[in-house]
């Protein structure tokens, strides 16, 4: 099953992991792994390290080997299981860095196009569903919970930075 609450109750993942990361790319809509590997464009995913609460930026050069990081980068708290890679627990990168424009700058991208999924002027408020996540993760990953509690502040600071960079001509925003 691709997506169902039955999946969530049975496996801990709203989206079927086997369906998303094996059946679709291997059988139903074959992914061109060779074309990906041969493409000179650098491809990064952002994951949140649950132990540190910090964003990590993973360069994917081989999608077969990197698919676990892709999965982790889209694993939402409470809707997905934590993804363990080399004894490190990861969740969605948006927890620690929702708009990774500063990391992109560190990689040398000084003129950027950023697509925002909300209208201009949007400000993130604390998520009302997060107390359930705090309870779920507090004992095992206190730094992750601390990051979650400040996510709206981090997101709004990233927006402020984007608007300033837009004024300077360094960022083109699509809202």
Show which residues each predicted segment covers.
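Patatin-like phospholipase
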Residues: 1-175
């Amino acid at each position: 099953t691709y997506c169902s609450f039955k999946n969530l109750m049975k496996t801990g993942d709203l989206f079927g992991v086997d369906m998303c990361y094996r059946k679709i790319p291997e059988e139903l809509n074959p992914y061109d792994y060779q074309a990906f590997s041969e493409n000179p464009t650098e491809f990064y995913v952002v994951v949140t390290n649950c132990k540190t609460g910090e964003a990590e930026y993973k360069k994917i050069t081989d999608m077969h080997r990197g698919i676990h990081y892709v999965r982790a980068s889209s694993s939402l708290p409470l809707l997905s299981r934590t993804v363990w890679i080399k004894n490190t627990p990861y969740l969605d990168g948006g927890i620690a860095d929702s708009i990774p424009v500063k990391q992109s700058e560190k990689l040398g991208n000084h003129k950027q196009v950023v697509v925002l999924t909300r209208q201009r002027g949007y400000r993130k408020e604390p998520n009302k569903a997060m107390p359930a996540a705090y309870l779920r993760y507090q004992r095992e990953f206190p730094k992750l919970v601390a990051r979650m509690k400040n996510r709206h502040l981090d997101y709004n600071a990233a927006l402020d930075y984007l608007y300033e960079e837009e004024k300077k001509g360094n960022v083109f925003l699509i809202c």
